[in-house]
Amino acid sequence: MILCESKYAISYQQEMKKIFPASESDSLWKAAEEAFQKLLEENPDQPQAVAKHTQISIFPAIAVYQTIAAKYPDQAMQVLENGAGTVSKKAGESYARLLKFPGIKLIFLKVFSKGVKKGFGPDAGFAHEFITNSDKTLEFHVTKCPYQHFCEKYDCPEIVHIFCKNDEYAYGNLPHIRFIRTQTLGTGGNCCDFKFMR
């Protein structure tokens, strides 16, 4: 896989072009690509469910952030926050459009819970506990997160909050669905407490 296959990385690159001259942006991007490949080489043979997160989201963020931070520490966080925010807000807009279709709000939480169990379960490096799982309320706590794990492993725990914020952008403004969260692992909490109410 190459860095530009990640939608997050492409968004980071667009943010870089806004901040840096073209030649410097290109140079940073090339260095980030090399850093990304190194991360892949250091973490071979990951299960597909884990790789879906590391290759698309986690490793691109680490590679871009550390590359920029080495020369421009004040701009590195800005690139990640703005770039990830753009992608996550688009995801939120897609969910919002979906929920406007007749009947979708009635089944959304049940379908969403299946997606959580499959894409954010033990096979993907997460641990979670479901508290409530009905058609009107979905509540679960994440107690282990690969985003936190890999950011800590590569000495950049300060970027974990960006992934947490992505959830707020994606789920925080949905019609008919209220998203509540009071803490995250990435911001010092005991868990990531997700609660959706219809």
PLM features: residue spans?
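N-terminal, charged low-complexity regulatory/assembly segments
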Residues: 1-68
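Charge-dense, low-complexity intrinsically disordered segments
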Residues: 3, 51, 74, 154, ...
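Hydrophobic, Leu/Ile/Phe/Ala-enriched alpha-helical segments that form helix-helix packing faces
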Residues: 16, 68, 120, 167-170, ...
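Generic structural motif
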Residues: 28, 126-130, 179
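Amphipathic interaction/junction segments at domain boundaries or subunit interfaces
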Residues: 56, 60-62, 66-154
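C-terminal non-catalytic interaction appendages of large macromolecular assemblies
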Residues: 136-198
